[in-house]
């Protein structure tokens, strides 16, 4: 069954801007929250998690990019990149998750 967000996250009104991404339970520092963005060729796609995480100059999350080499799929003829979100510190229940935006500086 498709789940747009990991079970430990939810979307709620944010004091930062509009809607934001919030922890439904405590999350430990270094936790891999999942995929926020995927780039195939020049096209960048964001997941619901990537779409709702708000910017902060003092973020509690960071992203890491992983290159995926395509060797088997004839429909996707290029390698692609996947960005995953990780927590930078322990996150409290109901705390908003934030990230320093850098994607649009690619």
Q: PLM features: residue spans?
A:
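Conserved catalytic SET/PR domain of SAM-dependent protein methyltransferases, capturing the structural core
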Residues: 1-106
């Amino acid at each position: 069954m498709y789940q747009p967000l990991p079970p430990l996250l939810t979307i709620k009104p944010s004091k930062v801007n509009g809607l934001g991404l919030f922890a439904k339970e405590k999350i430990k520092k270094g936790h891999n929250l999942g995929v926020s963005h995927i780039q195939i060729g020049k096209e960048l796609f964001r997941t619901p998690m990537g779409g709702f995480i708000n910017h902060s100059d003092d973020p509690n999350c960071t992203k890491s990019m992983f290159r995926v080499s395509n060797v088997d799929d004839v429909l996707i003829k290029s390698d692609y990149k996947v960005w995953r979100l990780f927590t930078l510190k322990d996150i409290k229940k109901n705390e908003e998750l934030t990230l320093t935006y850098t994607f649009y500086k690619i």
